[in-house]
Amino acid sequence: FKWIGRLNQAILGWKIRKAIGELNYEKPIIWTFLHQTAKVIDAINHSASIYHCVDDWPELLPMAKMGNPEQIKHDEWALIIRVGTIFTVSDKLLSHYQLPVGKVHFIPNGVDTTLFNPDDLPGTVLTEMSNLPRPIIGFSGSLGRWIDIDLIIQTARSFPAASVVIIGLNEKNPETQKLAGEKNIHFLGMKSRSEVPNYIREFDVCLMPFARTSVGQGLLPLKLFEYLSMGKPIIATNSGSLEIFRDVLYLADDSSMFIQQVKLAISEVDASLVRKRREKAHEYSWPARIQAYDSAISQSIDSKKIN
């Protein structure tokens, strides 16, 4: 359905041009998170153009039956060669392309360290969790196909006296049906963003059990920085993207090691590790991210003026 994509881009370009006229903007900065917007870039007179890549679309969208991987790559490459600047939230994203030198900036996700601040949270009693046995092994986020459901189940079975609590969206992953058979797994569903810190506060340790797929291996998710900002011990399946955070994570190379790392994290007593994680999160606060974006965009605009 290539014509649908072209039609969508034409409509989007027209709407943006209309808004630019109504707002009396001249040569705005075009900042897109959508891989299928090359024609939109062509249609708008701009001072700078940015593609902000937050996911491996050629792998992720076909999982949800939302496109052909080759067509997605074609559309994404058409965008890549048009924009002046590319931001990626993981150094593994876009690795299947031969990217233009100097155009790509690896800038991980930012975190709201004010919202995810355990010192400033209200004393809200979460009735869903108040009577659950401790320790609480928590997961916050989408249960997509990039999550290793079997590893969550293995964790629950390895710690039968603990409670495994999951908050977030079920991304129609058929594997999640297996969770219902585990007595100590509690799926609490979606929570508003303002509520999430209260739930993470109740977690004794936090999980990032990514599947051994190209999507899972390329993830550097927002939940990492939210967990860090709350100072929580984090157990994660190892990937190249997470190596730079090894000093603040319990990384595991396989399922057996993952369970051992959960055990170590649960028994953690060193308060300095909490401080270390929170300090790391502040390196990725939104003010720090905005400074990085601003620097890269300014370089792009200056380069365009010179050329």
Go through the PLM ranges and name each one.
Residues 62-65, 111-128, 177:
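Acidic anion/phosphate-binding donor-loop and adjacent secondary structure
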Residues 129-147, 152-156, 167:
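Conserved donor-binding/catalytic core segment of Leloir-type glycosyltransferases
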Residues 248-257, 263-270:
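Conserved acidic donor-binding segment of nucleotide-sugar-dependent glycosyltransferases
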